[in-house]
Amino acid sequence: MKTGKTLRAFIIATFSLYAIPLFAQKTPSLSDPEIASVALTANQVDVAYAKIAQEKSKDPNILEFAKTMTKDHEGVIAQAEALAQRLSLTPKDNAVSKQLNNDAEETKKTLNAKTDKDFDRAYIDNEVTYHKSVIATVEGVLIPQSKDAELKQFLQQVLPVLKTHLDHATMIQSQLPK
C-alpha cells in the first residue's frame, strides 16, 4: 500500500513540477537569454536522469534509452552553446530554469531511492512526463517568445527529436510490467 501511495505521489509531483506552461497560472515572459537558459537546463536535467538510469538499471531497453538520451541531449547542449556563442547570447538564469533545477534535484532523490523494477518504472514514467512537458513548453512558450530567428529555428529543429524521445519512452513504458 505504501509503495502505491509513494509512486502515485511521485507521479503527481512530477507532473505538477514539470507543468511549466502552467507556471504561476500564466505563461512566463522570457527573453532570448532566458529561453536559452531554459533550453540548456532542460537538456542538462534529462542527461542527469539518464546517467542515473545508466548506473541503476539492468533492463537493456532502459539502458539503451538512457544512452540515447545522454547522446542526443548532450548533442543539443553542444549545438545550443555554439548557437549562443555565435549570437553573443549569454544564457540568463530565470524562474523557469531555477524551477527546473529545483524539481530535478527532488526527482533525482526519488529516482536514486528506487531499485530494480521500481526504478525502471519510475525512470520511464518520469521520462514520458518530462518529455510531454518539455515539448509543451517549447511549443507554447519558448518558440512563440523567441525574438531571434536562429534561436527560434533551433528550437523548431529540436522539437522532432523531443517527440521521438517521447514516442520511444512511451513504447518502453507500455512494455514494462505494471
Identify what each model region corresponds to:
Residues 2-9, 18-178:
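His/Met- and acidic-residue-enriched segments that coordinate or traffic transition-metal cofactors
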Residues 12-14:
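Sec-dependent N-terminal signal peptides
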